C-alpha cells in the first residue's frame, strides 16, 4: 500500500525455509539502500555490519511499532486492536505504524525500535524479518508467547528480550 501511494517505506522481503525451518532472510529497503539479512546460526547484518536488537528492559522507555489490517471488516476486532494500541502507547514512549511489516521487524532487529506486534498478517510479510530478528537476539513468538510462531493463523511479537513478556501480557489482557 505504501509503495502504491509513493510513501517511501516499503521493502523487498525474501525468506528461505527448509523442512519447516527458516534458514535465510533478506529485507531490502530500496528507499534507503539498506539490506537487512540473516542466516540461521550465523547472525544478522545491516549492509556489511553485524546488528543486535536493543537492550531495552523497561517498556516505559521503549519505542514500539505495529501494523493494523487495512481491510478489517469486523468493527469489534478493530476496536479491540485500537484499545491495545492505546494501552501500549500509554505504557511506552509511543507506538509507530510504518505500514511495512518487513521494515518494522527489521528496525526491531537493528535496535532502532524496541518491539513489534501484529496479528492477522501474511506469512510472507513476516518470514524474513522474523529470522533476522531472531538472529539479532530478539525474542520472537506468536501473540500468545509461543515460540512456534510460523504457523496459521499468523501473528508475531518480536522485541528486545527484556520487554517481551510484558508486551505479550498486555496483548492478552493479563496485565
Stretches found by the model and what they are:
Residues 1-45:
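DPxDG-like acidic metal-binding loop motif
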Residues 52-175:
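An extended, acidic
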Amino acid at each position: 500500500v505504501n509503495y502504491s501511494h509513493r510513501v517511501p517505506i516499503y521493502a523487498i522481503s525474501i525468506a528461505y525455509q527448509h523442512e519447516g525451518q527458516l534458514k535465510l532472510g533478506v529485507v531490502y529497503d530500496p528507499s534507503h539502500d539498506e539490506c537487512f539479512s540473516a542466516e540461521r546460526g550465523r547472525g544478522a547484518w545491516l549492509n556489511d555490519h553485524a546488528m543486535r536488537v536493543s537492550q531495552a528492559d523497561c517498556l516505559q522507555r521503549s519505542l514500539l511499532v505495529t501494523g493494523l489490517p487495512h481491510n478489517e471488516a469486523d468493527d469489534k476486532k478493530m476496536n479491540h486492536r485500537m484499545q491495545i494500541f492505546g494501552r501500549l502507547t500509554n505504557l511506552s514512549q509511543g507506538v509507530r505504524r510504518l505500514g511495512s511489516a518487513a521494515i518494522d521487524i527489521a528496525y526491531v532487529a537493528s535496535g532502532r525500535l524496541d518491539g513489534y506486534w501484529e496479528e492477522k498478517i501474511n506469512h510472507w510479510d513476516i518470514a524474513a524479518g522474523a529470522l533476522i530478528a531472531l538472529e539479532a537476539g530478539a525474542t520472537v513468538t506468536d501473540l500468545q508467547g509461543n515460540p512456534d510462531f510460523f504457523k496459521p493463523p499468523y501473528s508475531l511479537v518480536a522485541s528486545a528480550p527484556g520487554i517481551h513478556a510484558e508486551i505479550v501480557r498486555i496483548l492478552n489482557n493479563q496485565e
